[in-house]
């Protein structure tokens, strides 16, 4: 085929499909007695791509992993948080079992098991959600609750969350409807006051109201891929009742709300049991006893709490847990940096006192596991900068002093060949 603007007689040419003249299009491709323009070619490609997508089988695990198998996989990547992993494994298993059986079992309608994760920063909330989605091979997206506002106000509309999920699976609606959505910082959209206000709270209670239907289950209308380019296309209809929503937040101060309730319910007077300072419950122990009434007092509206029936609490990670996180998971931080150095042909060794120093530093910063990478990165920055220029470097050793900025990493060099042979 050839690209032609005019035939041999100089006659004006037209596209045989859309009828546009050669002056209205960029290219006109000639075939045996027919012509097709570049716009029609693009349209044909889009049609074929859509048909291939519809005919392609939806990849889904043939067998749903059991709660034990889900928990075991989480153990490979997440240290500690045993109760939270158990709760998540059961909730996720029940959710996908419900989807496979068409929302009903023996005529009984099965409700959604959306999840609320409560735990301090860096305790593993996001990692748990990401690991679950990766293991189950389902689309996953994250949203920050602090950026959301009610429709019509400056900020991100809640239905943008579904748009992000669709983007992750190339706008395959069926695949998106089996996905997992993690909404972080959910504690930041609490009501500003327990008393109703005459002023509109568009980023607090207003967002909770907007999320209600989405989390419970509704048919969301989402603009198709390239919606602005093709405004005539119909909106995609996504059933959110099949999407698993996991909401997470630190809920700073919630432990005090729980403690207040427990103290109120405990006896007072001569017969009351008096607890010493040492017997007082820790923050983690208090959060493990959280009730819906505590969350309402904290600022979540009752209707929203009702849409998150499964509640899992995560404890603050101690020093030993942080040391484990540094070296035990399959994608442990020390293993990642060792693999990075190995690409340069150099071994990297972290001594035990270095791991302890990293954990202590993260504890003092109160950043949990999230702060570990920045500490290691800062300690290795100069070495990683110089390493590609080093000759005969064989090993880099990191100890406590390196982490605390008191000394440089120890670099061990291999002996040059001419020295080794005695020349």
UniProtKB/Swiss-Prot annotation:
Biological processes per GO annotation: cell division; proteolysis involved in protein catabolic process
Organism: Proteus mirabilis (strain HI4320)
Tree of life domain: Bacteria
Record's keyword terms, sorted: ATP-binding, Chaperone, Metal-binding, Nucleotide-binding, Zinc
Protein name in UniProt: ATP-dependent Clp protease ATP-binding subunit ClpX
Domain ClpX-type ZB: 2-56
Matching InterPro entries: AAA+_ATPase, ATP-dep_Clp_protease_ClpX, ATPase_AAA_core, Clp_ATPase_C, Clp_protease_ATP-bd_su_ClpX, ClpX_bact, P-loop_NTPase, Znf_CppX_C4
UniProt entry tagged with the keyword Repressor: no
Species classification: Bacteria, Pseudomonadati, Pseudomonadota, Gammaproteobacteria, Enterobacterales
Positions contributing to Zn(2+) binding: 15, 18, 37, 40
Subunit note: Component of the ClpX-ClpP complex. Forms a hexameric ring that, in the presence of ATP, binds to fourteen ClpP subunits assembled into a disk-like structure with a central cavity, resembling the structure of eukaryotic proteasomes.
């Amino acid at each position: 085929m050839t690209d032609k603007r005019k035939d041999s007689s100089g006659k004006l040419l037209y596209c045989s499909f859309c009828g546009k003249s050669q002056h209205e299009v960029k290219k006109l491709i000639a075939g045996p007695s027919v012509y097709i323009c570049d716009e029609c070619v693009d349209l044909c490609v889009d049609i074929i791509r859509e048909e291939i997508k519809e005919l392609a089988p939806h990849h889904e695990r043939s067998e749903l992993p059991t709660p034990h198998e889900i928990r075991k996989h989480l153990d490979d990547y997440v240290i500690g948080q045993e109760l939270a992993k158990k709760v998540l494994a059961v909730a996720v298993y029940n959710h996908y079992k419900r989807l496979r059986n068409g929302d009903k079992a023996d005529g009984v309608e099965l409700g959604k098991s959306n999840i609320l994760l409560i735990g301090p920063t860096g305790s593993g909330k996001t990692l748990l959600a990401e690991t679950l989605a990766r293991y189950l091979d389902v689309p996953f997206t994250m949203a920050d609750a602090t950026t959301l506002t009610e429709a019509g106000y400056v900020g991100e509309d809640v239905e943008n969350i579904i748009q992000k999920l669709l983007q992750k699976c190339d706008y395959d609606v069926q695949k998106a409807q089996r996905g997992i959505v993690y909404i972080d910082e959910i504690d930041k959209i609490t009501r500003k006051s327990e008393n109703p206000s005459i002023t509109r709270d568009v980023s607090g209670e207003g967002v909770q109201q907007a999320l209600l239907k989405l989390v419970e289950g509704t048919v969301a209308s989402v603009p198709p891929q390239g919606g602005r380019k093709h405004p005539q296309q119909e909106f995609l209809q996504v059933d959110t009742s099949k999407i698993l929503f996991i909401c997470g937040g630190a809920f700073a101060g919630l432990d005090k709300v729980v403690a207040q309730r427990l103290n109120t319910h405990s006896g007072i007077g001569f017969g009351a049991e008096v607890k010493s300072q040492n017997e007082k419950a820790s923050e983690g122990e208090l959060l493990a006893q959280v009730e819906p009434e505590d969350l309402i007092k904290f600022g979540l509206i009752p209707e929203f709490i009702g849409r998150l029936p499964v509640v899992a609490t995560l404890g603050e990670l101690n020093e030993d847990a942080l040391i484990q996180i540094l070296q035990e998971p399959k994608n442990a931080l020390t293993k990642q940096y060792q693999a990075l150095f190995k690409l340069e042909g150099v071994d990297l060794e972290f001594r035990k006192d270095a791991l302890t120093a990293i954990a202590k530093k993260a504890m003092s910063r109160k950043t949990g596991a999230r702060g570990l990478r920045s500490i290691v990165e800062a300690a290795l920055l100069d070495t990683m900068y110089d390493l590609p220029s080093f000759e005969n470097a064989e090993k880099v050793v990191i100890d406590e002093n390196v982490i605390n900025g008191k000394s440089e990493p120890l670099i061990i060099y291999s002996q040059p060949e001419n020295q080794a042979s005695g020349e």
